[in-house]
C-alpha cells in the first residue's frame, strides 16, 4: 500500500481562512487485499482506522461522521476549533474491474462497497486546456473561495475533491467557447 496526496495539497491550493484550520486529502491505495477480506470492505476500513489510531494516538480526534473516508482533526489547545485535518480515502484495484475502486457508503445496501472510479483522463485534459489558455488562476480563485466558505461555516458535507472537480468543470465550460 502507499498514499498519495490529492486535491488542494497536490495542486498547491491548501486552504487556510482566518482562524479556521486547513485540511489535506490523501488516497490510501491498497496494492493487495488478503483473500479473507476481499468482500469485507467495512472490515478493511476498520483495520486501517485502528492502525492509524495506534500511530497517531490521542493527538487527533476521529471524525466518525463520514461513512466513506476516514477523517482526523487536530484541535487547538482550547479545543474550540480544528487547526488541521486530514481525510483518507481508501482505493484499490478491484479484482473484477480494470480501473481502481474507491470505498464508499452505499445507502441502498446499508454499508460500504467498492465503487469504480471514472477515468480521470478527461479531467486531466480539462486542467491542461485551462492552464494552456491561461485561466488557471480562475480555478484557484473559485476553488479557494468555495472551500474557504465551507471551512468558515464548518460545512464538511462536500469533499474537497468534489469542489475541485466542479470548479474545473465550471471554468472549462466558461472558456470552451472562447
Regions found by a protein language model. Name each.
Residues 42-96:
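Conserved catalytic core of two-metal-ion nucleotidyltransferases
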Residues 27-31, 51-54, 111-118:
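Glycine-rich loops and low-complexity Gly/Arg-rich segments
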Residues 22-24, 46-48, 106-110:
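Short, low-complexity, polar/charged sequence segments that are solvent-exposed and flexible
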Residues 12-14, 36, 82, 96-98:
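Short catalytic/ligand-binding loop motif for oxyanion handling, primarily in non-cytosolic enzymes
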Residues 1, 59-62, 84-85, 89-178:
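The feature captures the alpha-helical scaffold/lid subdomain characteristic of nucleotidyltransferase
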Residues 1-24, 28-35:
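Active-site nucleotide-donor binding segment shared across nucleotidyl transfer reactions
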Amino acid at each position: 500500500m502507499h498514499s498519495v496526496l490529492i486535491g488542494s495539497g497536490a495542486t498547491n491550493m491548501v486552504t487556510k481562512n482566518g482562524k479556521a484550520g486547513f485540511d489535506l486529502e490523501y488516497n490510501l491505495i491498497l496494492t493487495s487485499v488478503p483473500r479473507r477480506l476481499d468482500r469485507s470492505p467495512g472490515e478493511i476500513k476498520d483495520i486501517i482506522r485502528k492502525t492509524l489510531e495506534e500511530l497517531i494516538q490521542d493527538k487527533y480526534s476521529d471524525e466518525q461522521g463520514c461513512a466513506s473516508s476516514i477523517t482526523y482533526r487536530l484541535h487547538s489547545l482550547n479545543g474550540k476549533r480544528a487547526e488541521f485535518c486530514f481525510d483518507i480515502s481508501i482505493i484499490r484495484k478491484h479484482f473484477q474491474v480494470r480501473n481502481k475502486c474507491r470505498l464508499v457508503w452505499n445507502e441502498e445496501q446499508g454499508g460500504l462497497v467498492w465503487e469504480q472510479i471514472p477515468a480521470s483522463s478527461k479531467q486531466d485534459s480539462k486542467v491542461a486546456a485551462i492552464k494552456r489558455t491561461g485561466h488557471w488562476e480562475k480555478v484557484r480563485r473559485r476553488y479557494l473561495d468555495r472551500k474557504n466558505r465551507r471551512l468558515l461555516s464548518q460545512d464538511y458535507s462536500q469533499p474537497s475533491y468534489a469542489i475541485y472537480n466542479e470548479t474545473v468543470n465550471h471554468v472549462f465550460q466558461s472558456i470552451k467557447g472562447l
